[in-house]
């Protein structure tokens, strides 16, 4: 229907460039600067420091199983090019040839309805629904465990009882699900679901990335530095959201503080109106805050014990891989 593989490879954007090119001008939404800075931060967050990934790694039987599981997940992620990207290009070609305007958020389902026979269509839609449910339930469980263990249980010591913790976890999941349902209609005000997700991750991921990486690799990192980093990231994320979505309000705030005539759209359009670039600046700012606060404050006795345990565990021989496991791991890396 689309002219074969050659026609798909030859697909071009409305601007005339190849739809498969990763090299774009600086002012492009996915310009080369954005790819090298902000998109890398999102990759680290999405596949290294996100809560549901960390939960799975920490629940592994040994370091060997954790590493091999991560490699398997990385291999499966490569398939996303064929599962997500290529069907999108095919949909763009197919519906353009048919003279139809297609909402990008509906491309995948519309393509399945158009090309799959009825029986396979039911199986594909069932698989898509199962994948969505799996992703949603992982996110809800991860968020619920964070809220229940790190906030509720610390304020209510009786919540450490397993039955109470389970009850609080269920209530938290229900509250998060209701909030998500109420928030869903507002997503249509953004330029598509994908752009909405990229915007949120670009603004909210930086403090999480910095806090987790500092906790793993920076020996002087402490809770005060982490709290300061999270607060800084949230504040800068709100500022970045206003700057990206309502530059008129942002310019008015800047003018109120004496910078008359300042315009984000006119003066810094090529950089500051790209969500990935803003996310990278927030990451750098959070890293600076983490370093300054951690250097200027002392670790508690409990934090010192935890840090020593982490760095000691890295040198411990108790959980080192056997020669056979090392060989398999190296082979998997290659």
Residue ranges and their predicted role:
Residues 1-334:
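Membrane-embedded helix-loop-helix hairpins and adjacent transmembrane boundary segments
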């Amino acid at each position: 229907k689309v002219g074969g593989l050659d026609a798909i490879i030859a697909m071009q954007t409305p601007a005339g460039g190849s739809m498969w090119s990763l090299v774009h001008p600086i002012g492009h939404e996915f310009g080369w600067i954005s790819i090298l800075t902000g998109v890398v931060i999102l990759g680290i967050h999405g596949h290294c420091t996100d809560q549901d990934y960390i939960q799975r790694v920490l629940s592994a039987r040994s370091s060997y199983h954790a590493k091999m599981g991560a490699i398997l997940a990385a291999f499966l992620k490569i398939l996303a090019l064929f599962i997500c990207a290529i069907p999108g290009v095919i949909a763009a070609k197919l519906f353009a040839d048919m003279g139809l305007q297609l909402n990008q958020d509906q491309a995948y389902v519309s393509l399945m309805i158009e090309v799959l026979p009825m029986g396979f269509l039911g199986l594909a839609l069932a698989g898509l629904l199962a994948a969505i449910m799996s992703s949603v339930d992982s996110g809800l469980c991860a968020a619920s465990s964070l809220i229940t263990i790190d906030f509720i249980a610390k304020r209510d010591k009786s919540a450490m009882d397993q039955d109470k913790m389970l009850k609080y976890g269920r209530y938290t999941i229900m509250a998060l699900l209701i909030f998500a349902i109420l928030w869903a209609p507002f997503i249509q005000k953004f330029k598509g679901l994908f752009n909405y997700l990229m915007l949120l991750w670009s603004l909210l991921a930086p403090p999480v990335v910095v806090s987790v990486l500092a906790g793993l690799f920076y020996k002087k990192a402490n809770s005060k530095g982490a709290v300061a980093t999270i607060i800084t990231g949230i504040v800068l994320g709100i500022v970045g959201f206003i700057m990206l979505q309502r530059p008129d309000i942002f310019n008015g705030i800047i003018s109120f503080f004496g910078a008359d005539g300042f315009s984000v759209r006119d003066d810094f359009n090529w950089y500051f109106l790209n969500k990935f670039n803003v996310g990278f600046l927030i990451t750098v700012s959070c890293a600076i805050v983490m370093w300054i606060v951690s250097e200027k404050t002392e670790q508690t006795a409990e934090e010192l014990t935890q840090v020593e345990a982490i760095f000691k565990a890295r040198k411990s021989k108790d959980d080192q891989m056997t020669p056979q496991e090392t060989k398999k791991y190296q082979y998997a890396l290659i």
